Amino acid sequence: MLQQLNKCLFVAIALIGTHSFASAIINIEDLRQEGEVGLFQSISGSLDASRGNRDRDFYTFTYRIDNNSEGVDSFLVVSQSERKYTGNIIDESNFFHGRVVFKNESKLHYELFVQRSENPFRNYRKREVAGLGFRYLINDHARLGMAFINEDEEDLNMVNTKTDRLNIYFHDDFEVGENIYFNTTIYVQPSIDDFRDDVKSSAIFALDFEVNEQVTISLQYSRFNDNAPPLNADRMDESISTKFSWNF
């Protein structure tokens, strides 16, 4: 067991210096305390740095708090990312997500959520989302969700766009080895008015190594697609990151 964890730590440390092609997608499903009752908190972060001809730093810090009762689950996620070049801040982004889940004795639960992000990494100034939907428990490790969301997005040129979308997501977190889990989260968000040509989607694949009950190391690959991106933005970007999480 100890030998296996040492191998996991070696791989994670080796990947800390992996270049991030874009800011990593925040995985809302990650570290959910579903099925547990009580107050839970977690802190996670990642760092990419290089020194030499060009000094560069890129960090992400995320705080999460869950407050679960017998009938209601609620959680809040706050994240901050920053890029520095030769000591000067060239980009920074922030993310906020709050969600309330109303549980019952069936496998179908209802949820309300709000989200706000400012992310120049993807060429938009801000994006605000409010949604109402349901969450279906497929089995003990897989979930399927659907919601109606209202999106208010403003690009870097201060052009504002409001869109009504469907939000469809699938999440699976299954054990592939002792204390090792493969985490998959997929989101598809088509516009209700333009179902074919205006679609946002993202996929997050992570290998989670549970060092102990409090510490988790995640190796994550994420990909984001937007069929109708903001002006001068690419339709697709990717990121590779190593994340360390502490639960308390």
Q: Where are each of the predicted segments found?
A:
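Repeated loop/turn-to-beta-strand initiation elements of outer-membrane beta-barrel proteins
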Residues: 39, 70-76, 106-110, 140-144, ...
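Transmembrane beta-strands of outer-membrane beta-barrel proteins
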Residues: 40-46, 62, 75-79, 101, ...
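Transmembrane beta-strands of outer-membrane beta-barrel pores
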Residues: 47-51, 69, 80-84, 114-120, ...
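Solvent-exposed loop/turn segments connecting transmembrane beta-strands
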Residues: 49-57, 85-91, 118-126, 156-162, ...
